[in-house]
């Protein structure tokens, strides 16, 4: 599906037509530049690769510099592929936030905030051991039993335990588009989207 790369600016709120205060996320969507056009004959599938945010040549590897020079564009910091654009695009074309003028809902892909090593209560919503009497101590937020004894004599794969939380690729579907501001490349989306302020997100129609 067609889309754009963008940067999460932060959250604010706007008033709807009936006077309700609606929380929304402000995203700087594009402008993105077409850096490669893939075809079924050459690449096995049809897609358009776009780049977002300029970066210096000295921070770009030589293979990527050749890739950008072939497209006739300046080096880009972030690249992503999209399919099924309605209009035919050429190398070097610019795609702006006006792509979403007729979109009522979008999907947003981002990287969730990293929270470090967390226990089972925060990471998986466990209730803890529960009782703090009958000899229990220092067990309020522990997972409890993680398996049987002599059989199967192991912990099964996939057992929910403490570990690294956050920093995952998260997709939020069907978020309502509240407003498109082309002159500032801004997109206002109802509710929250994954990631922290300044993080890169993918917006798909």
Swiss-Prot record:
Which Gene3D superfamilies does the entry mention? 3.30.160.810, Translation factors (2.40.30.10)
Q: Name one GO cellular component term.
A: cytosolic large ribosomal subunit
Q: Which Pfam families match?
A: Ribosomal_L3
SUPFAM superfamilies, A to Z: Translation proteins
Single GO term (MF)? structural constituent of ribosome
Q: Which domain of life is it from?
A: Bacteria
For this UniProt record, give its keywords in alphabetical order, as a comma-separated list.
Answer: Ribonucleoprotein, Ribosomal protein, RNA-binding, rRNA-binding
UniProt entry tagged with the keyword Ribosomal protein: yes
Q: Give the GO biological process terms.
A: translation
Q: How does it assemble?
A: Part of the 50S ribosomal subunit. Forms a cluster with proteins L14 and L19.
Purpose: One of the primary rRNA binding proteins, it binds directly near the 3'-end of the 23S rRNA, where it nucleates assembly of the 50S subunit.
Q: Which family does it belong to?
A: Belongs to the universal ribosomal protein uL3 family.
NCBIfam families, sorted: L3_bact (TIGR03625)
HAMAP family on file: Ribosomal_uL3_B
Query: What is this protein's record name?
Result: Large ribosomal subunit protein uL3
Task: Specify the species.
Answer: Phocaeicola vulgatus (strain ATCC 8482 / DSM 1447 / JCM 5826 / CCUG 4940 / NBRC 14291 / NCTC 11154)
